[in-house]
Amino acid sequence: GISLSGDLYFYVNPLADRGRHRRQRWFECACCPPNIARLIAYVPGMVYARGRSSVYVNLYAASRAAVELDGGRVQLVQRTRYPWDGLVEIEVRPEGVEEFSLLLRAPGWSKPARIEVNGEGFGTAQPGTYFEVRRKWKEGDVVRARFDVGPALVEAHPHVTCNTGRAAIRYGPLVYCLEQADNEHNVWDLAVVPGTLRAEWRSDLLGGVVTVKGKALALDTSAWAGKLYAPLGEVQMQAREVEFTAIPYYAWANRELGPMIAWVRLAEQKVGQSA
């Protein structure tokens, strides 16, 4: 995991932390840092792919591309704020070629997405597939797709016992986490209330990110003082409702040290609530 400054690295990427992990400038055995740089340099070549008479859009990012097809070239101009916004527009500029296919990747996490050509409905892209738009193109044709990037909770397979009663927060393709810097109560003691998530753009935070906010129960664990185990139901915890803030997981550990957690507790257990 690379820092936002681009010069500090993790060799492991924990999904929960008590505030002890800090990125390092270098390692005695440092194969991962240069591989990160290599991957970043390679990403532009992963955005598009081509066949003899088809162009595949694999990744969504504001970009321009010139693609050689049988019979001519096509230039593509992609406009989007993805992953913060699910709207993607691709302007097509054919040069010497008229009929070919433009295939859009529909992410597996998304709901079915409406596809439009020049403002008119063309079809619906099903998650986990490529949606084909084949036609005779003209200069300035625009294909538009809107993917549902709204915040959601994701659960693990029941055999992943350490995540029982927990969920991860997702916004579009990004996994989120709760970091202490954004939350008043200990993030390890927060139980997120399902159905309360909302997204909020913060241009002043971590280089500009969408945060996910919602309601949580802040658990008072003081009744467990001096106990590691107790008969089921004997210890009664109190809780109060608070607001939590989650940030993209890639952006954690770029501020002061503090606890972090990605798989958050869900507010479904029986606890008393206090004002």
Named regions from a protein language model:
Residues 97-117:
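Beta-strand-rich binding/interaction modules
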Residues 116-124, 172:
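Short strand-turn-strand beta-turns centered on an Asx-Gly dipeptide
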Residues 132-138:
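Solvent-exposed segments in extracellular or luminal domains encompassing
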Residues 1-91, 126, 135, 146-275:
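C-terminal beta-rich recognition modules with glycine/proline-rich loops and embedded aromatic residues
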Residues 106-108, 119, 137, 149:
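A short beta-strand motif that forms part of the nucleic acid-binding face
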Residues 90-98:
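Extracellular and analogous surface-interaction loops
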